[in-house]
């Protein structure tokens, strides 16, 4: 597979790894195998909500510290949701690979979803929905 390795850990987490020797950056991601396809009338929007809310704190970090952990070294942290998955990802210099991966694991497995932040996230998601509804080309996909 083009130098790409796929293996499964003892806890059944699958890992895809590809090393690019010439590159000085690392791009890491954690994919949660659940998306909008798994929603129904009772939990409609929950995947997108989790994507947003996971950045609001973990057992070890407040929201500010999550973003700061990658941005202070010139990296980028983001996420997206689609029908198949929730994907948390980060890009940084290779030197910071361990820092980036540790942060992604913390977000994916230790998010706390602080109650006081949830209403803010709900508003942000509604603003995103309004933005997409103003873009007719989005309805084609």
Regions found by a protein language model. Give the residues of each.
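Acidic/histidine-enriched segments that form metal/cofactor-coordinating
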Residues: 59, 66-141
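His/Glu-rich zincin catalytic helix
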Residues: 1-65, 102
């Amino acid at each position: 597979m083009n130098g790409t390795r796929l293996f499964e850990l003892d806890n059944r987490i699958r890992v895809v790894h590809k090393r690019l020797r010439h590159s000085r950056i690392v791009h890491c991601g954690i994919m949660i195998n659940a998306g909008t396809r798994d929603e129904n009338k009772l939990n409609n929007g929950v995947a997108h909500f989790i994507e947003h809310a996971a950045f609001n704190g973990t057992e070890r970090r407040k929201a500010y510290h999550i973003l700061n952990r990658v941005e202070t070294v010139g990296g980028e942290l983001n996420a997206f949701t689609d029908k198949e998955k929730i994907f948390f990802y980060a890009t940084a210099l290779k030197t910071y690979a361990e820092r980036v991966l540790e942060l992604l694991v913390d977000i994916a497995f230790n998010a706390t979803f602080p109650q006081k932040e949830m209403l803010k996230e709900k508003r942000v998601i509604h603003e995103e929905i309004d933005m997409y509804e103003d873009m007719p080309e989005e309805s084609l996909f």
